[in-house]
Regions:
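Residue-level signal for the nucleotide or nucleotide-sugar donor/cofactor binding architecture
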Residues: 84-87, 115, 145, 155-158
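SDR active-site strand-loop-helix element
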Residues: 1-6, 50-52
Length: 180
């Protein structure tokens, strides 16, 4: 099992969501990830390549999407035209046993969404009961993956907003839960 990246789609001229057979690396990192996948699969065809998205948890030592939103003291800026998944690390760990049973190949791996990062962030700020402004940011490339291939094999994640909500609940950070 190898972790790859959603970046293998970073050069795609299409809007997405992207399936595993439509790679288009747009930078050196992405090209190297795709090359790694191909080299490993050439030697061990039964290997599983997980094209992972941004991941988050609140106990992470480095900043991540959710921590950045929670710590924001000024306006947050996200593109209304950028679609991509962000995935709760706990769900990654919960899915690893099922991942070990996957047939060899590449799999898009993580939470799906039909909302832009701008829309997700607006909803998350509202859910947190915060007044932090969310402003439209510059366009960014979509890294919007179709994770259906893995889901058909039983590797299933909550959608992005449900995963964020679950993480906040796990850490008792939902305002309505703290008030009760």
């Amino acid at each position: 099992i190898c972790f790859s990246s959603d970046q293998v789609y970073s050069g795609s001229p299409e809007a997405g969501p992207y399936t595993e057979d439509r790679t288009a690396p747009g930078n050196l990192y992405a090209a190297q990830k795709l090359e790694m996948e191909q080299r490993v699969l050439d030697v061990l065809p039964e290997s599983v390549m997980l094209r992972a998205e941004w991941m988050y948890d609140l106990s992470a030592p480095k900043p991540n999407y959710l921590l950045n939103v929670l710590r924001a003291e000024t306006a947050l800026s996200f593109s209304p035209r950028q679609y991509r998944g962000v995935t709760y690390v706990k769900e990654v760990a919960q899915n690893m046993e099922r991942v070990m049973a996957l047939p060899g190949g590449a799999y898009n791996f993580g939470s799906e969404t039909k909302q832009s990062m701008y829309e997700i962030t607006q909803q998350l700020v509202r859910l947190l009961g915060r007044q932090t402004p969310v402003t439209p940011g510059p366009d960014r490339h979509n890294l919007w993956m179709d994770c259906g291939k893995a889901a058909r094999q039983g590797v299933v994640f909550r959608d992005v907003l449900e995963g964020l909500t679950q993480c906040l609940a796990d850490y008792d950070l939902l305002p309505q839960r703290r008030e009760n």
